[in-house]
């Protein structure tokens, strides 16, 4: 008989990791499934304000960011058409997504959740008391099935795990901008730590921040033309 889980969560980013932590702390039997291997790099989402820290604190992880080496952020530096302004960012922190996401998952595992990586999940038919999910291991190619009373999909906009008739339809506006990001090895002091640096223009913007390991996270959004 297939194993029955209380909650199966697809996607191990911050939403999935936090959901797994919450559910595991409630004593539920939790499986967290992620198609990539972790830790993995990701640019956006490495800056944390008071609200983000309050959420972590409410889950018993008040020092998670600092324990992982997170660096304080105290200012936002803006540049537009040759002019510059600096705004205060009280109690901000920066921590790479490699460190943060993995730490959140580790907390969920410590609370009792089970995590599986490099595994694709496909939600199948629903029964009165559970939902069936097909899992495929990327390394072995082996396919298996599990059942869960609740399935949470936290796989982002690019998810392909729901049946077509349940997935909804994403609409991309013609005027929407393209996003791009990378991690840069930079040993100059032009972009000091402790600040978010942003350049703004009519056709888009670029922002960067120095991480706890000295690398720069750089991301931008640009008009299509």
Pin down the residues of each PLM region.
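Glycine-rich FAD pyrophosphate-binding loop
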Residues: 12, 24-43
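Predominantly flavin-linked oxidoreductase catalytic cores and closely associated redox partners
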Residues: 107-225
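Conserved N-terminal glycine-rich FAD pyrophosphate-binding loop of Rossmann-like flavoproteins
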Residues: 36-57
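Small-residue (primarily alanine) positions within well-ordered alpha-helices
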Residues: 12-15, 19-20, 24, 108, ...
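A conserved beta-strand/loop capping segment in the N-terminal third of enzymes
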Residues: 52-105
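Beta1/beta-strand and adjacent pyrophosphate-binding region of the FAD-binding site
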Residues: 2-15
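Conserved Rossmann-like nucleotide-cofactor binding loop
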Residues: 15, 38, 158
